[in-house]
Amino acid sequence: MISKINGKLFADMIIQGAQNLSNNADLVDSLNVYPVPDGDTGTNMNLTMTSGREEVENNLSKNIGELGKTFSKGLLMGARGNSGVILSQLFRGFCKNIESESEINSKLLAESFQAGVETAYKAVMKPVEGTILTVAKDAAQAAIEKANNTEDCIELMEYIIVKANESLENTPNLLAVLKEVGVVDSGGKGLLCVYEGFLKALKGEKVEAKVAKIDKDEFVHDEHDFHGVINTEDIIYGYCTEMMVRFGKNKKAFDEQEFRQDMSQFGDSLLVINDEEIVKVHVHTEYPGKVFNYGQQYGELIKLKVENMREQHREVIRKEQHTAKPKMETVETAIITISMGEGISEIFKSMGATHIISGGQTMNPSTEDIVKVIEQSKCKRAIILPNNKNILMASEQAASIVDAEAVVIPTKSIPQGISALFQCDVDATLEENKAQMADSVNNVKSGSLTYAVRDTKIDGVEIKKDAFMGLIEDKIVSSQSDQLTTVTELLNEMLAEDSEILTVIIGQDAEQAVTDNMINWIEEQYPDVEVEVHEGGQPIYQYFFSVE
């Protein structure tokens, strides 16, 4: 029985909760409703929770109130994506409720879960039921009820998990799109993983780190990040050496402990990955030949690589001497845009953006990433264009905590961001800019072409894995195996008689032949529409479109 939770135990709950979420991040990602290739809910919740965990591990306290402040700060600054921001708000309210306590009992634990729910609902402009919010709410209500009957925090947490799981299983009945696709809510699943980790800690158990399975065809990849902090002659082991050995029947029997011990004599930075049939080795050594000779005792050498790190270091020094790092530009009004692709970044810069944050579908910048840019710019005012619906909440959170006066333009796509930035007037007030830039977002129709990562049926469209998908805003309107067919079906949905301008932003994976045929088709079918084509270089999306 656990009747009290202090800072030490709460820290372990956080650590185990974060680990369990990390172990299940891929599973949570797989529950994403839309088959768009993004690193969405699981990835973002994991990165957010990991940020909170790291802050806690670096600032341990027996006082649960003090530890809660630390945890909340870590989550707040590390929050990525809407799911990560909501997670940070759930625990922001939780931790606010315990900030004056040195330890808490089951009743206060339940009340804190409820306080977190109230904070999170306030943070979301239009709360949707059948999501992480619903699971958190139902779990908190169950906790309040159970706390009247038990003083045991373990028993309380067990009941919370039962009710959270019931709520999760019910999410398809509350959100039609979940039922159509046949999944439960991904954010709710992520939260349940955290709660399950909490219970493990309360029981004195540990969540073992999940070891990622490494593809046999993937060799050890090593980056040597010198940054000129050492002298070339100080490098003791000069050769980054890698080998892959396929075990042989008539060769020496492989014993990993013995192998590691022997290999460690050759150098440092040793990494050994044993995959039953193959062993993969990475080591920094002065004698690569000895490493290879040793490996041959066990079987056939099938992949070898040697890099001279001293020469790499000299090259880094030469480059750093010729290329000074640019200083962060300081401005009165910072215009900050989230961008994906060098071409798109150049478009934003040419239109007046002062600061570009690299991000987008597969890696949403955190609240802290945005805060740092604002602070380093030393601006008095900031205009933030997230250009992705999943970066909107992190942008708003960043705007709310910086000292500068900051506004967020609710751009949910790159085309919307370009349209909004076109309306920006540096001589106008923030509120004037916010009004006219936000208004421009409503006047542009955004579309995109990408590929599906799994089979599904959504919005009445049958989708096969690896097929192309045409989207208008977030709605899938076309999916075919042929790229040009998908594009033309998408554009037929986007273009109308009164359409005047079509902007095409070409991604890094677009095929020139498809682009040429698409432009010819547009000119034939919509001769009155002016077409503007830009090289965007964005990943994942072959094309972005905007119609005005």
UniProtKB/Swiss-Prot annotation:
InterPro entries: DegV_domain_contain, DhaL_dom, DhaL_dom_sf, FakA-like_C, FakA-like_M, YloV-like. Coiled coil: none annotated. One of its GO terms (molecular function) is glycerone kinase activity. PROSITE patterns: DHAL (PS51480). Pfam families: Dak2, FakA-like_C, FakA-like_M. It comes from the Bacteria. GO terms for biological process: glycerol metabolic process. Residues 8-200 form the DhaL domain. This is Uncharacterized protein MW1109. The lineage of its organism: Bacteria, Bacillati, Bacillota, Bacilli, Bacillales.
